[in-house]
């Protein structure tokens, strides 16, 4: 089984894939290693996700999420390894890479996320090659929900 996650700060969508077919979709609260400690992430995984998982071992985890910078990805990988029955690789990537892969596939293009926080990048068909820091969800995000007029 492969476990795939698409996470923002508000919610995380999870999907179990077996032999290339999605077999179960689940949801938990958002997981963001920029705002949550390793222990907080472990608690969410143990109490909210683990009870929803089907019996069996997870061969690989692909986590795409807000706050998954190269500096914070190890925190997330450790939390997953300590909380879930994973015997294989645990990969943690940014939500921006998920958007770029989903939108562009293997072609070059510009991908954007418009949500609580907004972001954009230029993707060369394999990786993000240009990205301007979005400054979080409070600064430089004029469309966000925290503005009061």
What are these regions (language model features)?
Residues 2-43, 128-129, 134-136:
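Short glycine-rich, Thr/Ser-proximal phosphate-binding strand/loop in the N-terminal lobe
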Residues 12-17, 101, 112, 118-123:
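Short beta-strand scaffold segments in enzyme catalytic cores
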Residues 39-53:
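Short, well-ordered amphipathic alpha-helical segments that serve as non-catalytic structural scaffolds
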Residues 52-84, 88-91, 103-104:
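Short beta-strand-loop/turn "lid" adjacent to the catalytic site in phosphate-handling enzymes
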Residues 90-98, 113-114, 139-140:
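Active-site nucleophile and cofactor-binding loops and adjacent substrate-binding regions
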Residues 135-143:
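A short glycine-threonine-serine/GTX helix/turn-capping micro-motif
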Residues 147-149:
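Conserved small/polar residues in nucleotide/adenosyl-binding loops
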């Amino acid at each position: 089984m492969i476990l795939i996650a698409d996470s923002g700060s508000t919610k995380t969508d999870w999907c179990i894939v077996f032999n290339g077919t999605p077999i179960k979709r689940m949801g938990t609260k958002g997981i963001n290693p920029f705002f949550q400690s390793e222990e907080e992430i472990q608690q969410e995984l143990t109490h909210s996700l683990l009870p929803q998982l089907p019996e069996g071992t997870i061969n690989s985890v692909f986590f795409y999420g807000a706050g998954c910078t190269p500096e914070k990805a190890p925190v997330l990988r450790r939390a997953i390894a300590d909380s879930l029955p994973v015997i294989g690789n645990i990969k943690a990537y940014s939500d921006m890479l998920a958007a770029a892969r989903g939108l562009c596939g293997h072609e070059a293009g510009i991908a954007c996320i418009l949500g609580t926080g907004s972001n954009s990048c230029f993707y060369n068909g394999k990786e993000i090659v240009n990205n301007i820091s979005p400054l979080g969800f409070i600064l430089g995000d004029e469309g966000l929900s925290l503005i009061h007029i």
